[in-house]
Regions:
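Periplasmic alpha-helical coiled-coil/stalk elements that build and connect Gram-negative outer-membrane
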Residues: 150, 166-282, 393, 417-420, ...
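Small/polar-residue-enriched beta-strand and adjacent coil segments characteristic
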Residues: 68, 76-77, 81, 103, ...
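Short terminal targeting/anchoring segments
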Residues: 222, 426-448
């Protein structure tokens, strides 16, 4: 239901009561505007987190900058790959463009609450079909956006902008972590191929000596078959490691936005090593850096904006409007062939018949806001749990690496002793092959554990939300 109060110029001249009407209308509008200047309530976020981590990184070492955490690995080739991925990854570029698109629209979120002016010109005919008129007019209307309507629109634009920024940041965090993972998978797989190649040479020598032992009737029953089966298993392991390296190189090429792997990557056969480090971030830092939490915060803002808009729709909608109409009689069948009529006044749209529907929408949006708050709380708890899990994994990998380093050193010393015994004639070359194989296996286990530790490190800073500050394109709308 809408009403409009207009005051033609001729009417104002003939009626002395107009000032009282104007004063009364002004008082009514003033009171409505004062009541309508209510803010949109945004609830406090349930952002309670522990003061410190229950798990801590083992040892004290270099302080890690969360914005450049991968540089702790001190691998120049990895640094170059990360820089290339940040500049050329297709998912990240899509997220950046979507953010720019949202920012362009967010600057116009309050456009409908600004004065609008329109002009029109048309030809009309009177009801008797006698005279034809030319009408020209200018109309202006201003939706005041009372009762939180304008603020809800601005809050919604802020939520959309925050959502797009969090999605862009999430893409960047994921891309960097995936580049580190793919690079690590590639280098570990190719290092394993080298070790398996040496193991294959040992197996081949064992099969040769097994044939000699068989001719001399020195072999045990089924010895040669076991040697051949071992050599076949090594060939299968080499094929699997080569497949893993190929998969990692293709994944890395996709992350960089390349058509295919670079042949130079075949030289990546030394996995990066992680030295002792110190985690500087505390649980409260997750609230500012973890994209999933920022996404949940944007959802809360969006839900609050929708609730505020629903509440505003339950109140009268007040607009100020005015128009000037000029009419010219084209047929000149009237005594006066032209006239003008200015008018100004408020528009009041009062919800009557659909007020129940609007109230139901408000109640529904209130429930949606409660759900968004629960989602935010879950995002906070999930972030803390992921960081704690990554810290626990790092601690377990540290313990495992220490044990494997002892085993690797013991196996290496055993190879040295065995070679010495062969030189002294106290043992045979065939007996020393098993020792060499055990040493290669221990080395492979150590490389795998060191790679798993780097993966846990990458998972830690992925959970923290570690990524460089994104470069804002020049001229990007803020």
């Amino acid at each position: 239901m809408a009403s409009r109060i207009t005051f033609p110029a001729a009417f104002a001249q003939r009626n002395a009561v107009v000032p009282r009407i104007v004063l009364g209308t002004g008082a009514l509008l003033t009171s409505m505007m004062l009541v309508g200047c209510m803010s949109v309530p945004v609830p406090d976020l349930p952002d309670r987190v522990p003061a410190v981590w229950s798990q801590t990184a083992a040892g004290q070492g270099v302080a890690v900058d969360a914005r450049q955490w991968w540089k702790v690995l001190a691998d120049a080739r990895l640094n170059a790959l990360v820089d290339e991925a940040v500049a050329g990854n297709l998912d990240l570029r899509q997220a950046t463009l979507r953010l720019q698109a949202v920012r362009l629209l967010s600057g116009t979120s309050d456009a409908r609450f600004r004065p609008e002016i329109s002009a029109s010109a048309k030809q009309v005919q009177d009801a008797a079909a006698v005279d034809t008129y030319f009408h020209a007019g200018v109309e202006a209307i201003w939706d005041l956006g009372l009762f939180g309507a304008a603020e809800s629109a601005r809050l919604g634009a802020q939520a959309a902008n925050g959502n797009a920024e969090a999605l862009r940041d999430a893409a960047q965090v994921a891309v960097i972590a995936d580049v580190v993972r793919s690079y690590l998978d590639l280098s570990v797989a190719q290092a394993q191929v080298d070790l398996l190649g040496r193991q294959q040479a040992v197996d081949a020598r064992g099969e040769q000596l097994g044939l000699v032992r068989q001719r001399l009737h020195l072999d045990e029953p089924g010895e040669l078959d076991r040697l051949r089966a071992r050599r076949a298993a090594t060939r299968a392991a080499i094929a699997q490691a080569n497949e893993n390296a190929g998969n990692a190189s293709r994944a890395l090429a996709l992350l960089l936005g390349r058509d295919g792997p670079d042949p130079a990557w075949n030289a990546y056969r030394t996995p990066p090593q992680l030295s002792a480090f110190t985690l500087q971030q505390v649980p409260a830092d997750l609230l500012r850096h973890r994209p999933q939490i920022l996404l949940a915060e944007a959802d809360v803002l969006q839900a609050a904006a929708e609730k505020g808009s629903a509440r505003a729709s339950m109140f009268p909608k007040l607009s100020l409007g005015g128009s000037i109409l000029y009419a010219y009689n084209l047929t000149q069948n009237a005594r006066s062939n032209s006239d003008s009529s200015p008018s100004i006044g408020p528009y009041i749209d009062i919800p009557l018949w659909d007020w129940g529907q609007r109230r139901a929408r408000y109640q529904s949006d209130d429930k949606q806001l409660d759900a968004a708050l629960l989602g935010y709380r879950k995002a906070v708890l999930q972030g803390v749990a992921e960081v704690e899990g990554a810290l626990g994994s790092l601690a377990r990998q540290d313990s495992s690496i220490q044990s494997l380093q002892v085993a690797d050193e013991a196996a290496r010393q055993q190879v040295v002793r065995q070679a010495r015994q062969v030189q002294l004639g106290l043992s045979s070359e065939f007996d020393g092959l098993e020792t060499q194989r055990a040493a290669l296996s221990a080395k492979a286990d150590l490389i795998g554990a060191q790679g798993a530790r780097v993966l846990a490190f990458a998972s830690l800073y992925r959970a923290v939300g570690g990524a460089p500050l994104p470069a804002e394109p020049e001229g990007d709308a803020q």
